[in-house]
Amino acid sequence: MIHSILLIGQSNMSGRGFPAEVEPIHNEKLFVLRNGRWQPMFVPVNPDRATAGTNLSESFADLYAKEHNVDVGIIPCADGGTCLDQWQVGSLLFDHACYMAELASRTSTIAAVLWHQGESDCEAYRYPLYQEKLTIILEAFRKKLNLQDVPFLLGGLGDYLPNYRKPNEFKNYVHINQALQNIAQTMPMTGYVPANGLLPNHDNLHFSAGALREFGVRYYQEFQKLEDKNKVFAEKSTPDNAIRTELEIL
């Protein structure tokens, strides 16, 4: 039985933390989807760019696996630098995430969806429509993937963004965070995860590795508030070749 986690959003969901700054997570129950099969989790979990690194899903998955005593598979579909319009229903990113989730669902059951995005929508002409657009996208994911009873977790933008080298670039981040909170308050099975106090890399744009470890814990704490403790996951057959062998990993 594999419980899986879908990652969607932009670079802070992809993860830009420097792996050398944190202790690696060693847990044989953690896997990542590659080419339709599961292999032991490695870093970077979401290699969308050469700069990909530590990911918040690592600590989230570690806590989930330990509490539920199950294998946990991560479905990495985040893409750095993307604005909300690039995630609209029918877009390449939306369809890719749905395809990967459906593929993963053949050998696992999706237990949570983690979203972090919004830096690219801080511009004055974008943020006023953020809540409306994201609501449509999230509802479409739920319908397409039949995830009505699955927690969706929306992470807030870092409060360090005003320190970015272009001070006005992200001045509207508070409006994005408010939109995320509004959605969490009105959409069933949806939670908001605050990023208050989390530290950035030197670029003042991406969360540091240590911050991502903590952020993953916060995501999991919010997940615990939403999950149905009595939910029974349907048994999914895992073909012999669905999980890569040690030899195949070499």
Provide a role label for each language-model segment.
Residues 1-250:
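Cell-envelope and extracellular/periplasmic
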